[in-house]
Amino acid sequence: MDRLHTSSADWPDHLATQVVRVRGGVLQAAGQSDHVAEETPVALEFNGISHATMLVTPTHLDDFALGFALTEGIVGGMADVRGVELETRCDGIVVQVEIATSCEVRLKERRRAMAGRTGCGLCGVETLPEVVRDVAPVADSDALPVHNVLRAMQSLRSRQTLHDATGATHAAGWADASGEVVLAREDVGRHNALDKLIGALARQGIAPLPGMAVVSSRASFEMVQKTASAGIPILAAVSAPTALAIRLARQTNVTLLGFVRNTDATIYSHPQRIAA
């Protein structure tokens, strides 16, 4: 990637606002403050073509754009990305991504022109095949001890600094085979957080094997779709998966775990990757 200009110093991830609290059913004195997460319209442009507008926490937007391009099948890898630039316009941010001209056919196939809701991955998709598109199965990988998966979820919690400040964000983390989260991203949208993580993995050249993705949310089918698109073998979620997510995980050779909390978890697909 030849050009990367992604300073986000002008875009805070949260701010303080005046509130009136109720405690024990009693109104408290005015003049108190609380920290709330920022939510900013972010437009993605590929080779000058407007593709999507999402509501995103305005941090790690380079990772977000790269992860989105990868998981949407717009680019096949970092070799297809020529540069990323950020620009403030009106009331939002434009992320301009320059990609190889050979990717423009795929771009047109996946093009979305919409104003998305928070973390909404389906806004603007017109037909069902566009939603449940073909994703290549993930490569087989060695089993990891279940203790390491549980450790990874606990490790993710310690990386949720924005959530600690605001209580409003999801996190997606990448844990190595030992269960240590070595990379994490947060966002108001769970899909956005996972895109940021996948983009960061690609940008930093971190291989998806061995290891796992852990998320502080439920596991929707699109979370599984993004995980499989990135070649990640295991997705562990703190909450429940959907039926479609389970079917897609089984089809794409992704080991899907839900309700990963403390010493418990439920394995919904490909349990051979989880060892005692």
Curated annotation (Swiss-Prot):
Catalytic positions?
A: C120
Concerning Pfam families, the annotation shows: FdhD-NarQ
Return the SUPFAM superfamilies for the record: Cytidine deaminase-like (SSF53927)
- Gene3D superfamilies hit by this protein: 3.10.20.10, Cytidine Deaminase, domain 2
One annotated Gene Ontology cellular component of this protein: cytoplasm
GO molecular-function term, one example from the UniProt record: sulfurtransferase activity
Location in the cell: Cytoplasm
This protein's major location comes to cytoplasm
The record's annotation in InterPro entries points to:
Cytidine_deaminase-like, FdhD
Q: Which key words tag this protein in UniProt?
A: Cytoplasm, Molybdenum cofactor biosynthesis
Q: Which family does it belong to?
A: Belongs to the FdhD family.
List, alphabetically, the PANTHER family matched.
FORMATE DEHYDROGENASE (PTHR30592), SULFUR CARRIER PROTEIN FDHD (PTHR30592:SF1)
Q: What does this protein do?
A: Required for formate dehydrogenase (FDH) activity. Acts as a sulfur carrier protein that transfers sulfur from IscS to the molybdenum cofactor prior to its insertion into FDH.
Q: What is this protein called?
A: Sulfur carrier protein FdhD
Organism name: Bordetella bronchiseptica (strain ATCC BAA-588 / NCTC 13252 / RB50) (Alcaligenes bronchisepticus)
